Amino acid sequence: MDFDSYDKKKTDLIFVGDTDNKTLGEFNIQAHPEDPEDLVNSFGNVSDDNPLLFAYVAKPAANKITFKDHPNIYNHKLYDYYAKIETRTYEEMKDKLAEYDTNYKVLDPKTSKFHEHDALGLYGNQEEGIYWVITNLVRSESNELKSLYASGESGWGYATYLDRLSKRMGEIQYQEGSEGLWIRGRYSRLGKSSYDMKWGGVQFGGDYKNTERKRIGVALAFDNGKADFNHVDGKNDLHGFNLMAYDTWRHEDGWYLDATARYGKFHNKSHVKTITERVSSNYRQSIFSLGLEGGKRIILNEEGGFFLEPQAQIQWASVGKASWKTSNDIQAKIKRGNSFIGRLGTQLGKEWIDSKNRKNNAYVKADVLHEFGNGQKAEFSADGITASRKWGAKGTWYDAGVSGQFALGKQSWAHIDLEKQFGGGLKNSWQINANIRWNF
């Protein structure tokens, strides 16, 4: 239908006198401008006090006909537009009917002339009919915009992951030998309001003792993940890698420090279904982070082997910018963003020596984490319309879990870590880490 809230005589009108329907008939109305800006202009000044009439249903059909709006599917990209539909009585509309062209023309075959008739007068008493009107144009985010936000936010969640010494290398104070190799597998589930992501990876590392108390090493990680978008029919595939260098110091009295530097890249490839098509998006971002972790293991009971280990950690991460076009020509730009996460936590556990004189342990842990950074900003534009979004802003969340290390041989160990994360908008988020280390 054609609508014009400024010149209402140009607006298309529907007239229904009666219907054979035994049950309620529901009809969609659809505006079809050449571009979204024309759609906005079509309803530019409608309101409760200035409704736009589009249909009149006479009394015989009044309880058999209803109308609803369909989203604007022509060239829509960032937003969907819905007309708010209501009904009015004759008393509410009688002073406004003169603004519309309710006449129609009929050809007289005898005279070959057209005669005008008032359509409202054809269907009985127009005072008893129902007048269907539009009172507002409601704008909502399109599936494309929702998916672009979810893809960006899930990539941020992956990029700002906070690694830890124990998850990476286990209990290195138990490990003898000047050189070591290790491999770690990890699986994470990270849920937010816009997405539910599962990702896993493998990390390989090696290090050596450059002094009696320090180890220097490097590690290479490869990750793959999938995110289901909430509220829309879409998914995101994520592939990433990173190279890490670390310098770990541990003192005999229980103190330790672990410094890390990490650089990597990840690739986001997403798609979402709209009313008319499948829209895809493809882009890459970089990651650079620096971290410092420290703590002290306090032996609570020498004979029982119970210990307490308070910990503190900070990580700064820079997530790179990206610029690309979606398959339906939405221009997308993500600006570089900075994350600064702090963690305070503790471990409480027990150490024991097995029959072969090898140390093992098990413990529970809990942490509070806070994001001090301002997150990452993005801008999406199409057809002269722009939408700005932001993710990764300040917030606090928590984790709790169980962990332990067990000797496999004289110079080999296995470490397992199970962790549940909650608060700060997280939903159904948890992580599993398992690593094996060999020393020489």
What feature does the model see in each segment?
Residues M1-P51, K59:
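Extracellular beta-strand/loop-rich repeat segments of large surface/secreted proteins
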Residues D2, G177-G180, R184-F440:
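Membrane translocator/pore-forming domains, dominated by Gram-negative outer-membrane beta-barrels
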Residues D2-D4, V16-G17, Q30-H32, A58, ...:
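A structural detector for beta-sheet-dominated domains
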Residues S5, P51-Y56, P71-L190:
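Interface/linker segment at the passenger-translocator junction
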Residues K10, T23, P36, K64-K68, ...:
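Polar, low-hydrophobicity, Gly/Ser/Thr/Asn/Asp-enriched low-complexity stretches outside signal peptides
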Residues E37, S112, G384-I385:
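Intrinsic-disorder/low-complexity loop/linker signature
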Residues N41-Y56, N63-T66, F380-T386:
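Short, surface-exposed loop/helix-turn segments at secondary-structure junctions
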Residues A61-N75, G217:
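Charged/polar, low-hydrophobicity segments characteristic of intrinsically disordered regions
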